[in-house]
């Protein structure tokens, strides 16, 4: 495992849409482990692959809810409901914070690091963190959201 260098601010990779992961091979598994280590090293609650310079549909989240790190490969948000507004920040935009309106509840489908499909119902802070990281896969940053 290794800590990866983060991409910051105006790096154009943060604005690009990520590609689907076709094969969860050893390189992808190492990337996931590196992302988890990088997230924790930088005191983050989530990290998406473009933040470490890789345009693949992968993100990791630890919402500090006791579940540990969760891995999402090729995620698809199936449902959104409710509304919440709270302040967000981002490891790629250090020192920047702003209130962002997001769905309060979501249902997301993804693959885990072993290629097993799962569906997760998330709400509150976990739902917010997932939506924030999912946006990164679409080339969207939290500063793009209007209240």
UniProtKB/Swiss-Prot annotation:
Fe cation binds at residues 90, 132, 136. It catalyses: N-terminal N-formyl-L-methionyl-[peptide] + H2O = N-terminal L-methionyl-[peptide] + formate. Keywords: Hydrolase, Iron, Metal-binding, Protein biosynthesis. Its EC number is 3.5.1.88. Gene3D superfamilies: Peptide deformylase. The active site is at residue 133. The keyword Phosphoprotein does not apply. GO terms for molecular function: metal ion binding; peptide deformylase activity. Its cofactor is Fe(2+). The keyword Repeat does not apply. Binds 1 Fe(2+) ion. InterPro entries: Peptide_deformylase, Peptide_deformylase_sf. One of its GO terms (biological process) is co-translational protein modification. NCBIfam families: pept_deformyl, PRK00150.1-3. Removes the formyl group from the N-terminal Met of newly synthesized proteins. Requires at least a dipeptide for an efficient rate of reaction. N-terminal L-methionine is a prerequisite for activity but the enzyme has broad specificity at other positions. Belongs to the polypeptide deformylase family. This is Peptide deformylase 1. It comes from Clostridium perfringens (strain 13 / Type A). The lineage of its organism: Bacteria, Bacillati, Bacillota, Clostridia, Eubacteriales.
